[in-house]
């Protein structure tokens, strides 16, 4: 959870730099996300009981197996890229809508020109900040059990997770709605329609989790596990050939 979430933050910033665009996040935004929307759910995941019977029924790891084997590394990369993708989508939404209104040709240069306007950049950063924060909360819910749908889990077995996610959403809303916090974080208030749009984007990590669980239950090998296993076997074959 933490590795994929932090990778999402890094990729969000790195992609904007490569495109020559202003930063989607301010330093205060990153600090807030790391302290609030990362830390609280991570603590809740750390004390999650999970299903002990199922865990004990799984075969043990071999001594030579990496901690990131069986799709672990692939999952980190996938969710990190997904979180970065939806955060950048939110960031681009504001200038894109203005470009559409003015019938301007879509290009990175035009996008950068619109983002040079202070009000446009401020709202775009608010969008990216909100999605990055909320998506990690949704992501934490799915990470309670990567092999089980959230509808099959028992949410009240980990009340700390409910509290962590609830507090996370309230605090994330506070930084865009409370005047004294909007001044500190340089954010703007959002309308109901904007909140619904950003919440919809933020759900994607959880939707991806449910999709992978569904594929696995239907007899399809878990995509992340298959990719990770293929990569491991490829590396092992190369070592043998050497």
Label the predicted regions:
Residues 3, 46, 68-70, 96-242:
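C-terminal transmembrane module of polytopic membrane proteins
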Residues 1-148:
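Membrane-embedded transport module
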């Amino acid at each position: 959870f933490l590795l994929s979430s932090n990778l999402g933050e890094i990729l969000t910033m790195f992609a904007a730099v490569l495109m020559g665009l202003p930063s989607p996040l301010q330093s205060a935004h990153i600090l807030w996300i790391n302290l609030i929307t990362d830390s609280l759910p991570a603590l809740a995941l750390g004390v999650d009981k999970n299903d002990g019977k199922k865990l004990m029924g799984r075969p043990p790891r071999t001594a030579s197996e990496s901690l990131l084997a069986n799709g672990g590394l692939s999952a980190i990369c996938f969710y990190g890229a997904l979180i970065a993708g939806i955060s950048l989508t939110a960031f681009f939404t504001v200038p894109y809508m203005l470009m559409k209104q003015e019938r301007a040709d879509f290009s990175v240069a035009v996008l950068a020109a619109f983002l040079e306007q202070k009000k446009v950049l401020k709202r775009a950063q608010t969008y990216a900040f909100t999605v990055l924060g909320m998506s990690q909360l949704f992501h934490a819910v799915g990470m309670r059990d990567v092999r089980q749908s959230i509808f099959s889990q028992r949410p009240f077995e980990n009340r700390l997770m409910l509290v962590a996610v609830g507090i996370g959403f309230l605090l994330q809303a506070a930084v865009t709605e409370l005047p004294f916090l909007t001044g500190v974080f340089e954010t703007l208030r959002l309308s109901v329609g904007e909140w619904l749009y950003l919440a919809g984007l933020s759900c994607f990590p959880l939707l991806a989790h449910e999709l992978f669980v569904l594929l696995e239950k239907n007899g399809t090998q878990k995509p992340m596990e298959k990719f990770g296993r293929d990569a491991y076997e490829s590396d092992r074959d190369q070592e043998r050939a050497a």
